[in-house]
Amino acid sequence: MDVKRDDALGWRVFLKGGTEPTERSALDWLHELNHLGAGEILLTSMDRDGTGDGFDLQLLELASRLPIPLIASGGAGLEIHFLEALEHGADAVLAATLFHEGILPIPRLKAYLAQNDLSVRI
């Protein structure tokens, strides 16, 4: 689910790779997906995507109130960002830019998470 902060809706849902805004609130859509039986949600903060500024922790905290497992996406730049996302409700974390650009080696991230008592597949 691609979402972007919005003054009226909190977070607005976008379609088609984030190019088409909807009138749906992300939290309303999460509730509907829960009702429909979704198994997990890939939740991407478009505002944070590619910034390296960290995941949208407020969004994760709100979304994690539902029983659907969440994969946090958008904003990772440092090892601690992954830990913060997991501490704020994400069940899994996803990143692309910092791996593709060689900013953070995956083995280093896995070691960091393991040192912080998080289960990782090494």
Residue positions per predicted region:
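Short beta->alpha linker loops
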Residues: 47, 76-80, 104
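Glycine/Thr-rich phosphate-binding loops of Rossmann-like dinucleotide-binding domains
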Residues: 7, 51, 103
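Catalytic cores of alpha/beta
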Residues: 57-95
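Conserved anion-binding
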Residues: 1-43, 47-48, 117
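Charged helix-capping and loop-helix junction motifs
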Residues: 22-27, 53-62
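Gly/Ser/Thr-rich beta-alpha loop segments that engage phosphate groups in nucleotides
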Residues: 20, 52, 76-79, 98
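C-terminal helical cap(s) of enzyme catalytic domains, especially alpha/beta-barrels
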Residues: 83-122
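Surface-exposed amphipathic alpha-helices with a cationic face
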Residues: 31-34, 60-65, 110-114
